[in-house]
Curated annotation (Swiss-Prot):
It comes from Haemophilus ducreyi (strain 35000HP / ATCC 700724). This is UPF0352 protein HD_1515. InterPro entries: UPF0352 (IPR009857), YejL_sf (IPR023202). Belongs to the UPF0352 family. It comes from the Bacteria.
Amino acid sequence: MAKQSKYQSKQFEQLSYDLITILEKHKAPVDLSIMALGNLVSNILLENIQTETQRMVLADTFSTALKNSLKAR
């Protein structure tokens, strides 16, 4: 989704591959995959970002980036 990242491409690609592999291993249909990934994102924000305002800004930024990445395809 991101056009620029502070993370190395290899690190990002490996993490993405691992997440996809887990979903495939469980034969998760699209709706279940999206639910699980959404829950993961929610938990990451709730556990790591202290204020609700900051969480909402990050959630909005993430949502916009996701929508933009779908337009590009």
